[in-house]
Amino acid sequence: MTQRDILGDDSPGTEVDPASSPGIERLIHHETGLLGDIEHYDLFYGGSMWCFAEAVERGLDCRSPLLNRTVDAIYERAIMPDGGFTLQWEPRVSVACRTGDILRYLIMAGYSDTRISNGIEWILSRQRHDGGWLHCPLAGACDQLRLVLFRRSGNGLTREGDTSVTSCFYATIACALALCAYRAVDPSEAVDRAVGSAAEFFLRRSLFRSSQGTPIRPHDGNRDFRLLGYPVLSQYDILHGLLFIAHAGLIHDPRCGEAFNIVISKQNPDGTWNMESFATGMLEGDGSRRIRKSKWVTLKALRLLTIADSS
């Protein structure tokens, strides 16, 4: 991935089969032979959605029979008639953060069919007044408790048209990155406009501030957005946000400066970056939470610098 994304070398002679790596083998469910637990497909770190996403991060793509079987199983259980993806709750409702994330990984892996274009239309049609996305049936502690105890979705969709409710950072980055990935293979004015509006959502907030200007520290156990991790599903940090802004072509906007300088200031003397955030949805968030040097965070920072340098 470093050769491909940083050095620009994607020649066949440098390819390594990721399917044979220990990282991929660890993700395969021993009973079904699929990536992750398909019966509990929405679980972080063990469900098929997570294991599919991590496998794509590790280099697996649509040429892999293993990935194809897993994608088919996820489609069978999680895709909705409206084009979005649902979690394991009743009634079944599409949710923006997971729809955006899964679509992005499908596009990254090289998939291209009407289910993806329908999903992109779902995203475009649900962008909100502030340029972001929300579209989550959970709102507040009661809905969270209902989900945990009864796997019931809540009443959060009543907030969609409420302009006093700010869109969600997690849902917005998921949908925005999906649009960026789609734009690279099928550009359109509608997608360009949506990407621009989403970029403004983050830039107005310096990529980590609330509408009131204070740094966001989520109340649900997730940590400060200025702490770097490697978001996979339903997560965010400033490096993730900056990479989206870079893909949107706006990395030189002055409003990126504070977040960009924070990232640069975190580089270690040997050129690496540390894994600092282990919130649920971050890679390695289910393991040791000791801050340490990370090849994943370093790779992501180098991706950002490569795009910024070429802009």
Where in the sequence are the language-model features?
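Preference for long, amphipathic alpha-helical scaffolds in soluble/luminal domains
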Residues: 1-311
